[in-house]
Amino acid sequence: MTTTTTTSNTSNNSNAQFNFFKMCIGRPVVVKLNNGVEYRGILEVVDGNMNIVMEQTEEYLNGQLKTKYGDCFLRGNNVLYISAQPRK
């Protein structure tokens, strides 16, 4: 019984995460990597492995803008968090 509940909770948690990402498509986000680098841009795609595609991406290190990219692909195993930002 406990295993079923845990599986159900895990499934519900995954659905909530997927719905959050779906809501963020086309919106500004901040993605922070495990190494401390932040990417700010428009979220285009997130897959089940947390691989991320962004447009109009800016790379920040220690709060300072380092580079601007048109398109950016971030590998999911490097992602620490994704934060939705207010529309500009």
Curated annotation (Swiss-Prot):
Gene3D superfamilies attached to this UniProt entry: 2.30.30.100
Gene name, Swiss-Prot/TrEMBL: lsm6
Domain of life from the UniProt record: Eukaryota
Protein source organism: Dictyostelium discoideum
Entry protein name: Probable U6 snRNA-associated Sm-like protein LSm6
Function: Component of LSm protein complexes, which are involved in RNA processing and may function in a chaperone-like manner, facilitating the efficient association of RNA processing factors with their substrates. Component of the cytoplasmic LSM1-LSM7 complex, which is thought to be involved in mRNA degradation by activating the decapping step in the 5'-to-3' mRNA decay pathway. Component of the nuclear LSM2-LSM8 complex, which is involved in splicing of nuclear mRNAs.
Any one GO molecular-function label of the UniProt entry: RNA binding
Coiled-coil features, chain-numbered ranges: none
One of the Pfam families matching this protein, by short name: LSM
SUPFAM superfamilies named among the record's database cross-references: Sm-like ribonucleoproteins
Disulfide-linked positions: none
Subcellular localization(s) per the UniProt record: Cytoplasm; Nucleus
